[in-house]
Curated annotation (Swiss-Prot):
Role this protein plays: Component of the eukaryotic translation initiation factor 3 (eIF-3) complex, which is involved in protein synthesis of a specialized repertoire of mRNAs and, together with other initiation factors, stimulates binding of mRNA and methionyl-tRNAi to the 40S ribosome. The eIF-3 complex specifically targets and initiates translation of a subset of mRNAs involved in cell proliferation.
Any one GO molecular-function label of the UniProt entry: translation initiation factor activity
Organism (species): Dictyostelium discoideum
Subunit structure: Component of the eukaryotic translation initiation factor 3 (eIF-3) complex.
Keyword entries, A-Z: Cytoplasm, Initiation factor, Protein biosynthesis
Protein name (database record): Eukaryotic translation initiation factor 3 subunit L
Length: 611
């Protein structure tokens, strides 16, 4: 047993991989304490579990070894990266049902027939063994969940995911039916807390499944939807916050709502078979857009976060906003609702919804880094598609500065968040090409390092680069009507292609405007006739282009405001046939020289050692 516990401890202290599957990005030094405090009860329960299953090791151990060699391609959104299951860890076989045995055999047959690295199955084989570290972390997770200790729950939540990534890299997690017997008499089916824990574990099970499979089979999608329905129905049907005797850390609550929208987004992009279409036609409520939005609205309404006294949420114990789970779940549902609205192409409504959120530096969305990044990513994208380039630049610059500071102070290393950061740099590059504006110096340097060459091509009006960056950075937009209802051949009506075409059309309108800007910055006054000759276009066409440019110089300021303002580095007006230019270029060279002088003087300051 000591060997197993050491393995579990080592696994806990490795760096956290904060992908979409969950887990917290902070390192805690007290993780080992939880294991040591509860080791006695765990050893007794593990011994009972060993005695119960010691006669079932024959065929299933062989299946487990075959399963470990499967070539399951990981999802781009996350998933375990590595290799083989550790062989020196004590494990206990799982008594598979007949259906699970058939699934395992079918998976092995598929992997043998499809040796290509690009092969991607639509289902995972079941887990065939329970490993001792996983058992330890599961018991810790259950015990801490029952004790309602925020930090202990968060540590156990993080540790359990890491152990699952280590021991189940190419298969599904053990089902809750396999794990409940380990808890013994501790588990009470009549307890609200225990029943809700079962629902939460199932959500983790399906989240892990979606992370490893690009397009899960229809049965898994339906089961995951039904589990979310039970979770939300349990929370929404409560008559009083005192009836819900649970407390979850913010990171887990965010993962819960974020995964709900992710699975909806994934399902909306599915390429379905004929039998799946027939099934969904008879069950239209499965991952329906209206139902997804309705649940988010219901959670927001139930949480009462906007109807309560804004000065003190905890004004009454009878208010659901006084319950931390409802309060934060409602808040995260607002952000997820903004995400859904952006995916559907309703950017105006998304920006209107964001007016409900306090965007201050100490707002609640800053509690979870993934939430912070997601909010500003979709905020910047919504501003970009609404042609509010100045506001998009502000939003993207703000979050990129924040991410840079967190990466230094908190050892912020998350593949998923890093990919989102690269996408935000790409969106900022587009904004800088369409509406040049001043941004943070460090952000500007990083942008030039990542997309400097593409920015130059964008400024020359290269549409192919605009399309390339948009395809890379923009979320994959979806339609409100599922493909199986709108028809099988939906290529012409692809919402993502539609949004791309609208964006490129806007860029085409500004293709000549960039060239016009490069000329008028050289003059304080110039005649329309002369500028038309330089551009080799008709003077009347130039008047139209100048009017268009003047219109696109202006952006609505801020949220909820109707005031218009030009914050670009140049402005002009036309008086009869003369163009009068107000050139307000930032003195970037001057700032650079001043900063260099100050740094140089600082390096020359003598330091005296009086000792």
């Amino acid at each position: 047993m000591s060997q197993t516990n050491n393995a579990g401890t080592t696994n806990t202290n490795t760096n956290q991989n904060n992908n979409r599957k969950g887990g917290n990005n902070k390192n805690y030094q007290n993780r080992n304490n939880n294991n040591q405090q509860q080791q006695g009860g765990q050893q007794q329960q593990q011994q009972q579990h060993r005695n119960k299953h010691q006669n079932q090791q024959g065929n299933q151990n062989q299946q487990g070894n075959q399963q470990g060699g499967g070539n399951q391609q990981q999802n781009k959104q996350g998933g375990h990266r590595g290799g083989k299951t550790p062989s020196n860890v004590e494990s206990f076989p799982i008594n598979l049902s007949q259906q699970q045995v058939q699934q395992l055999q079918a998976y092995q047959q598929q992997t043998q027939q499809n040796q290509s690295a690009q092969f991607q199955s639509n289902f995972l084989p079941p887990a065939t063994a329970l490993y001792t570290p996983v058992i330890n972390y599961f018991i810790n997770l259950y015990n801490n969940f029952k004790s309602q200790s925020h930090q202990d729950i968060l540590v156990s939540y993080d540790s359990f995911f890491k152990s699952c990534e280590t021991y189940y890299p190419h298969c599904a997690l053990p089902t809750i039916e396999n794990l409940i017997p380990i808890l013994g008499d501790k588990f009470e089916e009549s307890s609200f807390t225990d029943r809700f824990f079962v629902l939460l574990y199932k959500e983790i099970y399906y989240r892990y499944y979606y992370a490893l499979v690009f397009q899960p089979n229809i049965n898994t999608c339906v089961e995951s939807w039904q589990n979310y329905y039970q979770i939300f129905h349990t929370l929404l049907s409560a008559n009083s916050p005192n009836d819900v005797e649970i407390d979850l850390p913010n990171a887990w609550l965010w993962d819960l709502v974020d995964e709900f929208v992710y699975q909806y987004h994934t399902f909306a992009k599915f390429k379905l078979k004929k039998q799946d279409v027939d099934f969904l036609s008879e069950n239209p409520e499965i991952w329906d857009t209206t139902n997804v939005i309705r649940y988010l609205y219901y959670i927001i309404k139930k949480s009462q976060i906007f109807s309560a006294n804004t000065n003190r949420f905890e004004s009454s114990s009878e208010d659901f906003c006084s319950h931390p789970v409802y309060k934060m779940l409602g808040y995260y549902s607002v952000i997820s609702l903004v995400r859904v609205q952006c995916l559907l192409g309703d950017y105006t409504l998304a920006l209107k919804t964001l007016e409900l959120i306090d965007m201050g530096k100490k707002a609640m969305y800053t509690y979870v880094t993934a939430c912070h990044i997601t909010l500003y990513y979709y905020l910047g994208f919504a501003y970009l598609m609404s042609r509010k380039y100045n506001e998009a630049t502000k939003a993207l610059n703000t979050i990129l500065v924040s991410v840079a500071s967190k990466s230094k102070s908190q050892n912020f290393q998350s593949d998923h968040n890093e990919k989102k950061t690269d996408k935000m740099y790409a969106l900022l590059t587009i904004c800088q090409a369409l509406y040049p504006n001043k941004i943070d110096e460090n952000v500007s340097n990083n942008l030039k390092e990542k997309f400097g060459d593409k920015l130059l091509r964008l400024q020359k009006g290269d549409l192919s680069v605009y399309e390339e960056l948009y395809t890379f950075a923009a979320p994959r937009c979806i339609g409100p009507v599922p493909p199986y209802i709108s028809g099988f051949n939906v290529t012409a009506l692809d919402p993502h292609r539609l949004q791309l075409s609208l964006f490129l059309e806007e860029v085409k309108q500004q293709s000549l405007l960039t060239t016009i800007r490069s000329y008028i910055t050289l003059y304080s006054t110039i005649s329309i006739q002369k500028l038309a000759g330089l551009l080799q276009i008709d003077p009347e066409d130039l008047r139209v282009k100048l009017t268009c440019y003047k219109h696109k110089l202006f952006n609505v300021l801020g949220k909820g405001e109707t005031k218009w303002n030009n914050q670009l580095d140049i402005d002009f007006y036309i008086d009869q046939d003369m163009i009068h230019i107000d050139n307000r270029l930032y003195a970037k060279e001057t700032d650079s020289f001043i900063n260099s002088i100050l740094k140089f003087e600082g390096s020359l300051t003598p330091s005296y050692n009086w000792m």
